[in-house]
Regions:
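Loop/turn-to-beta-strand initiation segments
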Residues: 59-64, 87-93
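CheY-like receiver
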Residues: 72, 80-83, 103, 110
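Clamp-loader machinery-focused feature within the broader ASCE/P-loop NTPase space
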Residues: 1-77, 81
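Charged, glycine-rich active-site and insertion segments that engage polyanionic ligands
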Residues: 1-31, 88-91, 96-150
């Protein structure tokens, strides 16, 4: 389970979201993304809603999930302060397809990790108990996506 704010970089935002949500405690998360036709861009309107939601007090951890292939510059600037100093019990999860979609100042404020989402069909093809060490190693190498600089 995720215990601190972070940036998730994945090729398929919807698939990762479908894997993440069941791992979170029930009724503790809010997802913010552009619901318009071109829902790739995270806009200033979503940023304002995120800030408003973050300041609603909660005695338990609340996960605020921001999804977008691209984040408008104005939206990112609006979020800077709250990402740097989040209210008590607020955990931000930014999900995007590329690190370059975010300002360097946002990337410097939150840890980030690359996730290769596997669909259920891919999972079912790999029974770890029937694999030898070499096959497991090759599978892990094939699915690893971390650069030297990270």
């Amino acid at each position: 389970m995720i215990t601190n704010s972070q940036i998730i970089i994945t090729k398929d935002i919807d698939l990762y979201l479908s894997e993440l949500v069941p791992t979170l405690p029930l009724h503790t998360h809010r997802i913010f993304q552009n619901e318009e036709e071109n829902k790739d861009n995270f806009k200033i309107e979503q940023a304002k809603k995120v800030i408003k939601e973050a300041y609603i007090a909660s005695s338990e951890s609340k996960y605020i999930i921001l999804c977008g292939n691209k984040f408008e510059l104005e939206a990112q600037n609006k979020l800077l302060k709250i990402l740097e100093e989040p209210p008590k019990n607020i955990i931000f999860i930014i999900i995007t397809t590329s690190k370059s979609n975010l300002l360097p100042t946002i990337i410097s404020r939150l840890p980030h990790k690359y996730i290769k989402s596997l669909n259920k069909k891919e999972y079912s093809n790999h029974n770890i108990f029937k694999k030898d060490l070499k096959d497991i190693y090759l599978f892990l190498k094939e699915n690893q996506r971390i650069s030297k600089n990270d």
